[in-house]
Amino acid sequence: MSALEKSMHLGRLPSRPPLPGSGGSQSGAKMRMGPGRKRDFSPVPWSQYFESMEDVEVENETGKDTFRVYKSGSEGPVLLLLHGGGHSALSWAVFTAAIISRVQCRIVALDLRSHGETKVKNPEDLSAETMAKDVGNVVEAMYGDLPPPIMLIGHSMGGAIAVHTASSNLVPSLLGLCMIDVVEGTAMDALNSMQNFLRGRPKTFKSLENAIEWSVKSGQIRNLESARVSMVGQVKQCEGITSPEGSKSIVEGIIEEEEEDEEGSESISKRKKEDDMETKKDHPYTWRIELAKTEKYWDGWFRGLSNLFLSCPIPKLLLLAGVDRLDKDLTIGQMQGKFQMQVLPQCGHAVHEDAPDKVAEAVATFLIRHRFAEPIGGFQCVFPGC
């Protein structure tokens, strides 16, 4: 649920489909596995990557909200992971396994409001201020007055929320900040194209396997391993569908509308409702969140983000899928040494899913360089050239 075209630069809300002419290059090459071999698009449970799951209750003026978190690790600093728009905490699954094997740290991957399995009283409020407060409230609920050292790591929308959280001092024990493929300039440029991208996505899927297959073949996620666990957090069963009779019984072809003879409007309306129900039966999965309806918040997530990021008085890391992502403010800041930057080429917008080992290596090196964490085994830091 989140993807954006290269023509939009960084689809700042969801992850974007493959770069024109290349989306197929990496994923397409992997698709051709020889005669008689089929790729496995079946979903994988979160428990293969995280050690535990917890629903954190937070009291606020609107009532009690419940935030889903997935956790791993028992010592070292906490890496608090914030996903992009439309994604969920499960997008960090493969990265979690990779980083835990490199440095001593604890992982807390959070489903932001209206995403994943988090349940809030006011799910329509996706303002940067509200979501930043959510992050602070979850930290307080989990750790009380003595939170451990925490590094915020966010992808796309989650990166913006991480910056807003840091700049508002909502996490008192914050020691570091990492943004993944989110830059104010390119994000703002992409907003005009975002609705067109969202309209171009499938509205429904006939099974979880179908959703996973689409995410990989469209280039939204270029890593099948990650897609098999991540897409489970992006889609849900359509309302009114309690239990499909299994993916094998679901129609494989595309439902085609029959041409109708002229009839009364009442008859047509009745038939349309019946068609909608049939569509739900045959395509029982849809997106968990309608990103198009969050448009009024997009500007608030990203406007002023570069200066907010630069002003945070803590060590900072910026990971990008391409050097062309940098805007003027960040280019100047990078030249002045205000943050560490690393470019991870041959990735789509979902950098941490497409190249989880490379992202884990970059984050682990950052943690060790600043003496925030201890390496595990024979992990060797690889210092980037930029």
From Swiss-Prot:
Pfam families: Abhydrolase_6
Matching InterPro entries: AB_hydrolase_1, AB_hydrolase_fold, PPase_methylesterase_euk
PTM comment, free text: Phosphorylated by SIK1 following increases in intracellular sodium, leading to dissociation from the protein phosphatase 2A (PP2A) complex and subsequent dephosphorylation of sodium/potassium-transporting ATPase ATP1A1.
Chain intervals with Basic and acidic residues compositional bias: 268-280
Source organism superkingdom: Eukaryota
Complexes and interactors: Binds PPP2CA and PPP2CB.
The protein, known as: Protein phosphatase methylesterase 1
